[in-house]
Amino acid sequence: MATCPVLQKETLFRTGVHAYRIPALLYLKKQKTLLAFAEKRASKTDEHAELIVLRRGSYNEATNRVKWQPEEVVTQAQLEGHRSMNPCPLYDKQTKTLFLFFIAVPGRVSEHHQLHTKVNVTRLCCVSSTDHGRTWSPIQDLTETTIGSTHQEWATFAVGPGHCLQLRNPAGSLLVPAYAYRKLHPAQKPTPFAFCFISLDHGHTWKLGNFVAENSLECQVAEVGTGAQRMVYLNARSFLGARVQAQSPNDGLDFQDNRVVSKLVEPPHGCHGSVVAFHNPISKPHALDTWLLYTHPTDSRNRTNLGVYLNQMPLDPTAWSEPTLLAMGICAYSDLQNMGQGPDGSPQFGCLYESGNYEEIIFLIFTLKQAFPTVFDAQ
């Protein structure tokens, strides 16, 4: 397995008095600004999550480096008596509004406890910003207006984690990927299903999309173009030994063609991964407009060796490349962002990922040509 050279590598969050988990990354192209979010915890365990923190980075095109400002707490992203988890940033380019979605869970109630008792106490929350994350609105609890009575049909749920998606349709639809453990039968354990929260009015109101197949958990979505047709591609964690994917022809409302992606292996309990779409940089006959990039641990036994995978035929689950290594050793969750053209003329990406035994969250920049040079050699 080849190892990818990188343009920059820097630790943004390091475990000490507090632990940090669950990275989320957003690139604001016009501002040349990166926003790196994470959960700040009293310890590494989920039950000890506390707050969501942010570091702001300024990208310098001349040096191809990002200068990061100190950590700050997103103080508005707190529901009283609850811990804030699973940061999911989303930027509406049309209204220039930044949303930060997350879940709020009371006290030290664990996901396992909710699955065991089948009592859902998780809340869907959001804050927004009109100045690129410098100041934030008061918290909105969207649970009743968005989920309503369906909330009690779930044992628990979560969003993301990681970046969300604005579609290129006329409405500029906003999609927040999510999953819910549904209580389908009193005698059975709750089963996880991925789906999307959808807004057609720039975040004023939200609705539930329909579910992907069962055994789909933490997920991300990307918009892919196949000529004149657009599809929403969903890639989800599973317990099946490999990722699962599905596609939506109607902007995230319904998903179809659910497939296990055998080339994208999962460790025994699965792990979060990240996917982004980007414009095909090579003009070839019959080439698709959009390619996909995906990051995830490459070992089927453990969360180790972070790899990046390329798919030049996005809807074909067999078309994923072999991985190129981004980082050796223990790793876990990651989040990708497309940062436009890199210094070598190929697309450039930022990646924020968990390293070591959740000791660090590291940011790095690499280009497509660095990760997959043979794609360009074939031109």
Swiss-Prot record:
GO biological process terms on file: ganglioside catabolic process; glycoprotein catabolic process; oligosaccharide catabolic process
Residues annotated for substrate binding in this entry: 21, 41, 179, 181, 218, 237, 303
BNR repeats: 127-138, 197-208
Localization in the cell: Cytoplasm, Cytosol
Keyword Repeat recorded: yes
Active-site residues, Swiss-Prot/TrEMBL: 46, 303, 333, 354
Keyword Heme: no
An example Gene Ontology molecular-function term: exo-alpha-sialidase activity
Protein name per the record: Sialidase-2
Superkingdom assignment: Eukaryota
Pfam families, A to Z: BNR_2 (PF13088)
Entry keyword set: Carbohydrate metabolism, Cytoplasm, Glycosidase, Hydrolase, Lipid degradation, Lipid metabolism, Repeat
Task of the protein: Exo-alpha-sialidase that catalyzes the hydrolytic cleavage of the terminal sialic acid (N-acetylneuraminic acid, Neu5Ac) of a glycan moiety in the catabolism of glycolipids, glycoproteins and oligosacharides. Recognizes sialyl linkage positions of the glycan moiety as well as the supramolecular organization of the sialoglycoconjugate. Displays preference for alpha-(2->3)-sialylated GD1a and GT1B gangliosides over alpha-(2->8)-sialylated GD1b, in both monomeric forms and micelles. Hydrolyzes exclusively monomeric GM1 ganglioside, but has no activity toward the miscellar form.
Record-stated family: Belongs to the glycosyl hydrolase 33 family.
Sequence motif: FRIP motif, positions: 20-23
Catalysed reactions, semicolon-separated: Hydrolysis of alpha-(2->3)-, alpha-(2->6)-, alpha-(2->8)- glycosidic linkages of terminal sialic acid residues in oligosaccharides, glycoproteins, glycolipids, colominic acid and synthetic substrates; a ganglioside GD1a + H2O = a ganglioside GM1 + N-acetylneuraminate; a ganglioside GM1 + H2O = a ganglioside GA1 + N-acetylneuraminate; a ganglioside GT1b + H2O = a ganglioside GD1b + N-acetylneuraminate
Entry comment describing in which tissues the protein is expressed: Highly expressed in heart.
CC per GO annotation: catalytic complex; cytosol; membrane
